[in-house]
Amino acid sequence: MKNIIKYLFIFLCFLIITEATHFRYGTISWAPTTKYNNIKITVNLAFRTGYWGSVAIGQQISHGNIDFGDNTKTGLTMTVTSKDTDNEWFTATWSGIHEYSPQPTAQTKNYIVVYKDCCRISTLLNNGDQYWHISAGIQIDSSNAFPNVNWSPVTNMMPIVRVIANKNNNFRIIANDQNKQTALSYKFTDTWTMDQPPGMTVDSINGNCWFLPTKEGLYSTQIKVTDALGAYVVVDFLLQTYTEVGKCDPTCSNADASCTSNSQCTKCSNTGSNSINTCTNIQSPPEFIIPTPKNGETILFPIDKSSEFYLSCKTPYASRTASITTSSIPTELALTTTSTGQTNSIKYSWSPKTSSIGSYVISALCKDSSGLTSEVRSFTIRIEKPECGNGGIKGGDGKCVCIGNWDTIYQCFECKDGFYGDKCTVLPPCKNGVPNGGVNGDGKCLCNNGWTGSDCSVSNSQSCGSMTSSILSSSNAVSSYLNPIKAQVYLANDKKFDFPLVLSIPSTLSKLDVYLLVDANMNSAATFLNIYNGMDNFISSVKKFAEDTQFGLGIFSDYPSNSITFQPNSNIGSDISSAIREFKPSSYSSSSNGNSLLAATQASSAQVGWNSGSFKVIVIITDIDYQANPTEKSSFTNSLIDKSVVPVVIGFGSPIPNWGASISSNGFGYTVQSAITSGDWSTKAAAGIKAVSSKLVYKSGEMANGKSLVTSLPIGETITQSTQKTVTISLLKPATTNIESPVAKVSVMGYGQTVISINSNRQPTVSNSGFSVDQNSFATFKLTGSDADLNILTFKFTSFLDSTAGIITSSSGVDVSTQTNTFYSSTEVFKFTPKKNYIATSSISFIANDGCVDSTAATITITINRINQAPECQPITINALLNQQVGISLSASDFEDVASKIAIFVSNPSPLTVYGSFNYQDKPITTTTTINNPWQLTFKQIVNPPSAISVGVPFKSRDSASLYSKECLITVNFVHTNEAPISSSLSPVPVNPRDKTTITLTSTDYDSTSATFNIKSFTTGTDGKGTFYICPQLGDCSCTTTQIKLQKNYVSSAVSYSTNIANLGICFSNDQSSQITDYASVTFTSTDNQGLESLPVTVNINVVGTRPNSPPTIISIPKYSVFQDYKDYDKSSKIIDGTDTDQDDYDKSQGVNNLIAVITEKPKKGTLYLKNDGSVASNSPAPMEIYYVPNPGTFGDDTYSYKVIDTLQASSTIATTTVSVIQINHKPSVSADSYSFTSQDVQFEKSLVTSDFDGDQVNCQVIALPNQISMYDSEGILITQVPAKLSKNSYSFRLLDPSLIIPSPFSNVQSQFTVNCLDVTSKTDPFGPLQSDDLIVNVGYIYINTPPKTKTLTVQLDQDTSKAFTFNGDDIETPTSDLKVKIFSLPTNGRLSNQYGYLNGTSISSRTYYLNELTYTPNAGLSNWDTEDNNSPLDKISYAVLDKGGLSSETDLVYFSVRPRNPPIYTGKDEINVLQNTRYPLTIIGEIGNGGSSVAISVVSFTGNGTLYETFNMGSEGTIDRQISSYPVNRSDSLVGSYFYAYKPPHNQYGDDFDTITFVLIDGDLVSKIYTVTVNVIHVNQPPTIKLISYKVLGGSGKEIEFGSNSTVNMNINTMALVKYIGNDIDKDQVGPLGSKVLNIPLTGTIYKFNNETTPLGAIIKDKNLNIERNDDGFYYFVFVPIKGSTGQGYARVPLIVIDDGGLVSPSESVDFNVNNINIPPVITIDKEKRSYSLLTNLTISATKITFDDPDSKNNDVSITISIVGEKDETVVPFSNVSFTVTTGKATCKPDSTLSSITCVGKKSELNKVISKIDIIAKVAGNYRLKVFVDDLGYNSPISIRSSTHLNATDYVTLQISSPEVTTQNSSNKTVLSGAIAGAAAGTALIAAAMWKMLRKAAPPTDAFFDEGAFLGDGVNSNPMYQESKNGGENPLYLASNETL
């Protein structure tokens, strides 16, 4: 049980120790991202929970900042990931991506990222109160792409690792590397100087640590883990050592013995191994069990799949419970507890994303309910980098094929452009900004300057006229009681604005700062002592008001001759209870100069460490009211308002009406008078703080330049509970005010303040500008201006062009000179068009308006450049006539040339030459034909187009300077010329005798719709009996009564053409009885509907005689196929034929075939043609060879039917043949217009016009490039080789470098290019893909001088430097070196210069400058910080670029952005006054230089007479001072530029210029001047000191006794004591002797002044105010006389002080007096008759009548020793020689075991009974003595002197022992007796020793009596108990004694 209590105590001690500060553990790791210079950094830290009060997992906490190693840093806001409530720590993590500067290709750069702060735990056995420094080595590698770049190692540890003192402890640092697992090395850190725990080693290969601590306590350690490429991380944690009781190993000689260290186990066989403990544990700690991952194990987690692991631990004791604590768990892990109790199990699960790739080391610890812990278990979760991220797979080409919106360039680890986040979501709209895209982006739109809104579509600008007073921007602080704390407000003129202020005040304040200002010049030390004594009550009372209360302390002294206005003692956050106790006032006086108000003014404005977001109170304690003038009172009030500090004033024992009046007048604060008691002032001060915190008082700061704009404040009120409300502050800007950048400060007294920067409208500005334009050209321009308030500007012309100069039109085409009062927007584009050939310079002027006010006017100068004008041509239209030549007369003109110098070129004659001959001077016209005046051409049409058409032929004129005109057209109108039809019919036509037949007349025409048939002539037979007629049903010759007989010149009605064929059937009958050849005939023509008549056709008629006839037989044509649109007819001809059994009709052997083939049904999808003449087949003598031609575009099956008839018109059956038309691929076609462009044209994309009958895709290519003209493909890529594919069948042109144009640059170029196209088809029969015909296209470039181009330029330079710069300008005609600039305005905040000096208004108006000629120098001290928003460019100028022809670019601007280079500024005191022997808190606050970003400090030197400390406020843990031992010492840990130090002068030294401190302030690479703070150590009257020297007891020995470690005077009853002491004072101004007084007169005894040695008693000191004068020897004396006859311990106490001339009192020294009784020695009485005995051996004799007495021993014990000694010496004889016995009774006795001796302790009566009878028997004859020794043990003396006041008495009885005179006697008797005596002596010694030990326990006597060595000798002589008592009278402490022994 005792051991358990012991261990619990040790454990609790460690808990207390570990609360000393807040840092526990840290490590930093990093990983690359898809951009090599964007590094993801992860910081894992552990802190003490109590520093934050309490934390919860997932909570956000902030602490310190991280330095990225590139002069940038950021504050850390971390997420709590785990916590240990038993040991009161938690872990937190921060992760962020930092962008480092890009590196050149294939280069690396190393950075060190650091998290550093102070201070470590004070009680560490190493590194106590030192900085912690957590770092990682980062490598930026531009040579590799993600994910191949290096990653840092990753490690982890429990924040506190428990180890056993004096035993070997083993634990392992587990680390993992995403790149290579076996390449890590381990060692103690070398990145920061720190002490490692002694006895600890680290294995460099596997991270095994061995530690044999020899002390209990806490150590810190830091291990560095480095990979093969040099990237490193560290892990910093604590080692807690404790002692544990175990047992020794069985191999030891003291096996199973209890032990606490290995060294206590001896002779063990396994000694010497650093891995084995010979002292092993008794209790078994809990252990991790399966399925917990093994130590060092790596678990792979796949991406996008849920994975899990378990932690399970168990204690072997059923009565205990187990719990698991983890460190730095990834926030994505989900936790589930699966079991609790003796076994504890938890489950973690995770479905990681690609963004989580990396390694995560998890550390865990198992604890049982008794406090025993397991070893640390660490393992790794590893999320592997796949070859392709986010679901991508590797393709056959080795590249990643990504899904979704992941980018193959980054192996699917990065989003494509336009997407963001871990799911690559589409970026939302971002109209005027840059979207934060990419896998690490959040999709938010980062707006360009002037835009806001989620999509940056809302302009920050608006018209001044529409603007209302509003908040432009504001800053809130979470910890503030009021918000916003800063705001920018726009105030419209003469309009009041109510500014909202939100108050959020909890019932218990969250933060409270109390600065205690104490009057150090109280009227007495006792008065000031009440301040000391009341401090703890004050602190504890005030702490109840807030969750976090911090205190500071300052002092002032109103002592007139040595006043101190204000002296800081301890900054906010200090332990003021200790600080006030350490402070020693320099004076005590009721005199006062009344400077308490002045002190409060300085204290309230001093840098004492006020915390942001706290309620601020200054408590002033003074015992005298203030005296001050009105100015001082006003300064006091303004200082409090400016800092928002509320005063509480305590009149300490004195009324303070002036203070009350000021507080009442100010309207805030609290005053009260308190009694001069510790309880009253502390209670009332606390009540005052409570009172002021319950009042809301609003004040406007007088020290702010914008105070006059605050017109009203909220009414104050009292609050009693939590308050959430919004109040309003009224602001109003007068119409006219001369306040520049007004700022208002409004304080809610104590609770904080809001700073309001007030903006109002300012006049816009415009600048002079200009532009130039070529003669007869045009130019566009905009009106521009700027407005400091970002208002929307509109513009108005104030002067216009002369009407002869030209016209300026708006975008709507309206002449602006007709709109004299129109305002235009800034986006309006104006067009200037000069009058034709007008070349004079013109100007216009304009103003800008912001909605409220106009700018001053600016001028735009317009310069017209005279240039050669291109000639002009006029288009012409002619009408062509088929087969007739027509003349074409062209016309052209030129401004400079006569007609004879103008030539005309036809750009592309081919559109006309396809229809006929196009000639100049009887020669065909080509593109190179030069046509001179009079420009006469001819054209003869030879091709008849199918329909009317107009054809255009482009031509241009060229002047003598080879300048071409724009393109004109020769338009030729063609009409189609009708062609006569073709008539046909079958001839001869057979007819039977006396029979009739039908004759089919056919007309074929391709350009007509109908025809009429004309019977020109006919013969009716050789006998004239034949008849030609027509039946009403055409083709039906059976009519008789309705016959219409043909007449000559008969004209039929119109017959429509069907498939280009029209037929008319006429009838013929005969009455001939026999066969007659050419019996009759008919001749006809056909006339189309356009009046053209065909040639005549004659049809003969044969009369065939009657004969037996059989119908013929048709020969069927099998199904066959033809190709669609295929023209190779020979391949598809077929023969229609038949056979006939009648040899007259058909005899193949005789070559007779009189059959007629007849088409009975024509095909529907095509046409049958005769092979011999290509006419359409209808009927024809057999065999009839035909061709089937499908109609254009058709395909599929078609049929036609046919038969044969014999000469007797007998018909065969009708046969039908199917023709399959097979679809084929058709050749594509392509066309393109000729194109010409100028140097002023933009790049237009041109497209080829393609077509394909089959609808196939057509891909075109360039097969010949134009000369001297750059041609670009569809993607805008220059074509350098042909053939070159055009992916979109589009192209564009640009001029080559002019220098490449032949014969001369900047000349016109005419050229052509050739393209063809290929279709894309799957067809292969009869052919596959087909290529179009080559198309030659003309292209021309017309040179027009192109205006130069420029763009806005921003010149970057540093403040107070000059920068040569080059204007942005380029021109295709003019080399850059020849371009010049025209400057229209000069900079306003700097100067332009060249080699000849500074430019001025005259020089810029009269000349131009080369692009690189000028240098800009800003005015001294000016930078961008001096602009309205502290960020805009400092200066600007307007300019235009001129080419060598004088043509100008548009006007543009050069901005001069002057980077502020203002180092931080120190505005504090350069001299501080430090009070002697006083710690001075020195706060150095660096103000960020204008435009700067941070403040760091380097203390360069210190003279070192005193001591300089770095000071760290640890919150509730107080303040830590770290002495600075070497210089320079750098700090950069403050985000606000405040650095705290403390100065302490050496003791009792002072003087002006006592020390100097030099330092510089740093911002990145900016270093301030060296600042020097001079330390004056002000002499402060130091209190004197008093020292006790000695005392002398008068009436005694007179010996002077020096005071030792105590101040006690021991004196006897009825004596007196003289006390001697001395007073000292180090102050040089202490001239006279110090005064001395007795603080309190003792109640017993009397104090006298010392007179002299003869008559020592001087005057009685009855009054404590009576002074004791210093004696001539420099000492002070007094005499103390106790009351006669009285005694006592602590009889009296006399406190003494000395006092200097300033009233300062030394610390008191007290003399204690013990008045002692005189101790009376004991007396032994032996009857005279009993003083000698004679006896024989072996006989017993009784010694009697022996008594003793000790007169002053009443109830206390005394000691008696009885022994047998020799006759002449004190040697105790053995009890074997002589022995004795006594009756001990109630006494406590102890006999010696071998000697004849016994010692007894008891009351006097008890011991007298012991010695009343002593029975003696001797074995050995001889002369002996019975010795009786009595010791009073000094009990009558004070304890303090008891050891020196033992008194004793000794007496003897003589023993004469002889042997009996008998013959049988032998020597054995002597032997026996001698043995008895010897035994008795030995027994006596043992009894004495035993009694000594017993007495030592029973009653603590002095060391001299009870020393352990007293009984270690061979005899009793060495024991002081056996020292013989001398005569009592010889002892000066004895009373007189009559006893003689």
UniProtKB/Swiss-Prot annotation:
<keyword id="KW-0472">Membrane</keyword>
<feature type="domain" description="EGF-like">
    <location>
        <begin position="420"/>
        <end position="457"/>
    </location>
</feature>
<dbReference type="InterPro" id="IPR056849">
    <property type="entry name" value="Ig_SibA-E_3rd"/>
</dbReference>
<dbReference type="Pfam" id="PF24910">
    <property type="entry name" value="Ig_SIBA-E_3rd"/>
</dbReference>
<dbReference type="InterPro" id="IPR056844">
    <property type="entry name" value="SibA-E_N"/>
</dbReference>
<feature type="signal peptide">
    <location>
        <begin position="1"/>
        <end position="20"/>
    </location>
</feature>
<feature type="glycosylation site" description="N-linked (GlcNAc...) asparagine">
    <location>
        <position position="1505"/>
    </location>
</feature>
<dbReference type="InterPro" id="IPR056847">
    <property type="entry name" value="Ig_SibA-E_2nd"/>
</dbReference>
<feature type="glycosylation site" description="N-linked (GlcNAc...) asparagine">
    <location>
        <position position="1400"/>
    </location>
</feature>
<feature type="glycosylation site" description="N-linked (GlcNAc...) asparagine">
    <location>
        <position position="1777"/>
    </location>
</feature>
<feature type="glycosylation site" description="N-linked (GlcNAc...) asparagine">
    <location>
        <position position="1848"/>
    </location>
</feature>
<keyword id="KW-1133">Transmembrane helix</keyword>
<feature type="glycosylation site" description="N-linked (GlcNAc...) asparagine">
    <location>
        <position position="1866"/>
    </location>
</feature>
<feature type="region of interest" description="Disordered">
    <location>
        <begin position="1921"/>
        <end position="1941"/>
    </location>
</feature>
<protein>
    <recommendedName>
        <fullName>Integrin beta-like protein B</fullName>
    </recommendedName>
</protein>
<dbReference type="Pfam" id="PF24909">
    <property type="entry name" value="vWA_SIBA-E"/>
</dbReference>
<dbReference type="GO" id="GO:0007155">
    <property type="term" value="P:cell adhesion"/>
</dbReference>
<feature type="disulfide bond">
    <location>
        <begin position="447"/>
        <end position="456"/>
    </location>
</feature>
<feature type="glycosylation site" description="N-linked (GlcNAc...) asparagine">
    <location>
        <position position="1738"/>
    </location>
</feature>
<feature type="glycosylation site" description="N-linked (GlcNAc...) asparagine">
    <location>
        <position position="1606"/>
    </location>
</feature>
<keyword id="KW-0245">EGF-like domain</keyword>
<dbReference type="InterPro" id="IPR036465">
    <property type="entry name" value="vWFA_dom_sf"/>
</dbReference>
<dbReference type="Pfam" id="PF24907">
    <property type="entry name" value="SIBA-E_N"/>
</dbReference>
<keyword id="KW-0325">Glycoprotein</keyword>
<comment type="function">
    <text>Implicated in cellular adhesion.</text>
</comment>
<dbReference type="Pfam" id="PF24619">
    <property type="entry name" value="Ig_SibA"/>
</dbReference>
<dbReference type="InterPro" id="IPR056851">
    <property type="entry name" value="Ig_SibA-E"/>
</dbReference>
<comment type="similarity">
    <text>Belongs to the SIB family.</text>
</comment>
<keyword id="KW-0732">Signal</keyword>
<feature type="glycosylation site" description="N-linked (GlcNAc...) asparagine">
    <location>
        <position position="1530"/>
    </location>
</feature>
<dbReference type="InterPro" id="IPR002035">
    <property type="entry name" value="VWF_A"/>
</dbReference>
<keyword id="KW-0812">Transmembrane</keyword>
<feature type="glycosylation site" description="N-linked (GlcNAc...) asparagine">
    <location>
        <position position="1652"/>
    </location>
</feature>
<dbReference type="InterPro" id="IPR052108">
    <property type="entry name" value="MEGF/SIB"/>
</dbReference>
<feature type="glycosylation site" description="N-linked (GlcNAc...) asparagine">
    <location>
        <position position="1869"/>
    </location>
</feature>
<feature type="topological domain" description="Cytoplasmic">
    <location>
        <begin position="1893"/>
        <end position="1941"/>
    </location>
</feature>
<keyword id="KW-1015">Disulfide bond</keyword>
<feature type="disulfide bond">
    <location>
        <begin position="430"/>
        <end position="445"/>
    </location>
</feature>
<dbReference type="GO" id="GO:0016020">
    <property type="term" value="C:membrane"/>
</dbReference>
<feature type="transmembrane region" description="Helical">
    <location>
        <begin position="1872"/>
        <end position="1892"/>
    </location>
</feature>
<feature type="topological domain" description="Extracellular">
    <location>
        <begin position="21"/>
        <end position="1871"/>
    </location>
</feature>
<dbReference type="Pfam" id="PF24908">
    <property type="entry name" value="Ig_SIBA-E_2nd"/>
</dbReference>
